[in-house]
Structure formats: C-alpha cells, structure tokens
A protein has these predicted regions:
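Bacterial Sec-dependent N-terminal signal peptides
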Residues: 1-24
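N-terminal module-boundary/linker segments of secreted carbohydrate-active enzymes
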Residues: 23-46
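Extracellular glycoside hydrolase catalytic/binding regions
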Residues: 26, 188-339, 343-362
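Generic structural signal for residues positioned in beta-strands
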Residues: 33, 46-48, 275, 330
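Extended, alpha-helix-rich binding/interface surfaces that flank or overlap catalytic cores
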Residues: 330-332, 337-403
Length: 403
C-alpha cells in the first residue's frame, strides 16, 4: 500500500510546485524536497550543456579519430597549427552556448541548466603550475560561467555547476573526463585532490550570493575502484567543508560511484543541504529501476535529483520523465547539441569539409590543406550557434509534453 500511495502524494506535490517565473531565494533542502526560500516545492526540469566546455569525441562524430578532448585538440593543432587551433576554440566557446540558447530554453519550458565544467578552463594542471602546490586561476572558465549565469538570472533559471572533468580525471572512462592515462588520476594524486578542493572553494567564493546558482554538483560520474567508496566520501567531505567556509546557502549535489549509481559509504548525508544525484541510462523506465534511490530518500529524509539521462528513443524519454516527475524527482537531460544526432535537443550540421578531416585522421583519406582544415573548423564554430542548429521538436515534446 505504501508504494501505491507515494507516487500519488508526489503527483499532488507537482500540482503545487512553484512557477519559477515568480520564485525567489536560494534553493534548499526541506526533508525529501527541494524548495525555495518560501518553502515551495521546486521541480527542476533541465538540460545539460554537454560539448561546450568539454568536448566528448562521440558528440562530434570523432570516436574513431580520438579518445579524448585533449587528443582532438592535439590533432587539430597538428593539422592547422597552435595559433589557428586557439582561434577556433575561442570562437567555438563563444558560440556554442549563447544568450539565444538560454532564452529559447526558458521559452520552451526548461527551468534549469547543468553546466559540465572542465577544470582546465579555470586552473592549470598540476604539472604546469609554476610552483608546486600553487593554484593559478584562469579567466576563460570564470568569464564563460559569469556570462551564462547572467543569462540564467535574466530568464529566472537555475544554473547547477557540474565538475565534469576533474584534475587528473575521476574514473576509467577517458572521454567523459578527458583523462590522460600517462598522468596520475584524481584518486592517485593528493595534489590533484587538493586542486579540486581549491577550485570548488574558489567557485563558492565567487557565487555564494547568487540565488540563481542552483547548487554544486561536486564530481560527475566517478567510475573507479574505491574500496567502500572511502576515498570518494573523504574527498566529498573535504570539498563540502571548504565550500561551507565561504558559502552556507547552496545545495551540494552528491553523485555515487559507478556513473552516479553506487552510494555505498556515501550515506547518511553529512551536510543539511545535500541532494543525492543519480544518473539513468539504458535500462527500463519502471519504478523498480529507481526503487533503491526512493528507499534512500525515505531512509535518510533527503531529496533526489536525476542529474543526467538521455541517449535513447523519444518514447523512452517520455516514459522516463513521467517516472521521475510522478515521484517528485527533478531532472537534467543530456544533451543540448550534437553533430548529426536527433537524440539531442538540437542538431549541429556537419561542415562541408568535416568528413575529409575525419577520413584523414582515421587513415581513410588524404590530408587536407591548412587552409581547407582551418576553414572547416571556423565553419563548425559558426554552425554550433543556436540560429544555425536544427531544433528537434520530437525530443522537446517527449521531455516537456508539448504538442
């Protein structure tokens, strides 16, 4: 009987969930719910900004050519030179996510964004620091984040910061964290862990008074053998403690090991403003598949957030969103834009010379000239703009119930 009642109760909560156009104040934890400062239930409906600060090869049809973003950049540099590569990336980062994207997302019905951050836009790798143990802060990442936040504030949308690629990398899946296997991982290096802690404190200092920052998603999808998750719990606790020295208000989102699914050793919550964030891919959309998270919510009186899902059919999307919302679980979908894919919210069209470059990189064709290759990459930096992307209305319909 209890399992039958719970979805009904949460469905009733949705009927009184706040309209964010009139919401005020920081998000916070209230028992099993995420609420605003008026105590109104807030159901997050969001999109992950994948491919912007961190380019996973598959999102650009480059899986056969490169394993990580670093490898992509190295190949581009070898083809067109460092100066041209830097120019391309400046335009790409400027154009991939703009105010037009955020305005449209708000208009369509989304109320939040999840920003997958690459640490190297904010600080130097440990082996490039002028002094060992020093943290050199870089302007590009902070400026991009500031701009994005200003667009979110204008649209009254929450922005959740997600450290997608940590110093050293948090797992064995190389593409999602831009991992160099010749360098120490996050879990093998105290210096990388200290830089991660310092970065989160720096972010918290910068955004502590920003009510449209929805919270801090500390580490994306750890996937590493950690006995009892003790090292993960230790690092989460240390990051949380440093954040709380400067910011007592924002939610801290905690993902489990094994791609945000294993919470061994990560309960009970050690902070009064923690939300547990699970991810869901490639399994049925039945309540049984999320029951362990519902049980965790019930046992520890803590909210849940489904921080990442996607890469499936529109029918699956629709059923998954229904499952989450019937159980008062906010969500963030993956992802906003990809090349040649209709499972993302928008599709980036492939530049005319793009396949020639891919063929060269995969040993299937001749090398393009510097001029040809640079023109192709600069065209890509134009094609990622909102106004040049194809909107996949079927995906939007599946997520938001539009007609």
């Amino acid at each position: 009987m209890k399992n039958a009642i719970v979805p009904f109760v949460f469905a009733c909560c949705l009927l009184i969930s706040v309209d964010l156009a009139h919401a005020q104040g920081f998000l916070k934890v209230d028992g099993k719910k995420i609420v605003n400062e008026k105590g109104e239930n807030v159901l997050l409906r969001g999109i992950g900004l994948g491919g912007w600060m961190l380019q996973e090869p598959y999102m650009f049809e480059l899986s056969d050519a490169a394993g990580t973003q670093t490898e992509i950049k190295a190949k581009i540099t070898a083809l067109i030179g460092q100066k041209n590569c830097d120019e391309f990336y400046r335009f790409f980062l400027t154009n991939m996510i703009t105010e037009k994207d955020v305005d449209a997302l708000k208009k369509w019905g989304f109320n939040s964004l999840r920003l997958p951050m690459h640490y190297n836009l904010y600080t130097l790798p440990i082996d490039k620091e002028p002094l060992k143990g020093q943290n050199t802060w870089l302007e590009p990442g902070f400026k991009l984040t500031d701009n994005l936040l200003s667009w979110c504030k204008k649209n009254k949308m929450y922005l959740i910061l997600d450290l997608h690629a940590t110093p050293g990398g948090q797992g064995n899946d190389r593409p999602i964290a831009d991992i160099d296997t010749l360098k120490p991982r996050l879990w093998e290096s105290e210096a990388n862990q200290q830089k991660t802690i310092a970065l989160w404190k720096k972010l918290a200092e910068r955004y502590k008074d920003e009510e449209w920052i929805g919270g801090y998603d500390l580490i994306n999808e750890t996937n590493y053998k950690l006995e009892g998750n003790e090292s993960l719990k230790k690092l989460f606790s240390e990051i949380s403690a440093e954040i709380r020295k400067v910011d007592m208000k924002h939610i801290i989102f905690i993902e489990g090991n094994q791609f945000a699914n294993d919470y061994t050793g990560l309960t009970p919550p050690w902070d009064k403003n923690i939300v547990y964030s699970f991810h869901k891919y490639w399994n049925p959309t039945t309540i049984e598949t999320i029951q362990k998270y519902l049980d965790m919510r019930e046992k520890y009186n803590v909210p849940l957030w489904m921080g990442e899902s996607g890469e499936n059919t529109n029918e699956w999307f629709r059923d998954a969103v229904k499952l989450f919302e019937n159980n008062n679980i906010g969500w963030s979908w993956w992802t906003i834009k990809k090349i040649g894919s209709e499972s993302s919210l928008m599709t980036i069209s492939k530049p005319a010379g793009y396949q020639k470059i891919v063929d060269f990189w995969t040993g299937k064709g001749p090398k393009p000239t510097v001029e040809e290759a640079k023109a192709t990459f600069m065209d890509l930096a134009e094609k990622v703009k909102f106004e040049n992307c194809k909107i996949n209305n079927e995906v939007m319909d599946a997520l938001l119930g539009k007609k």
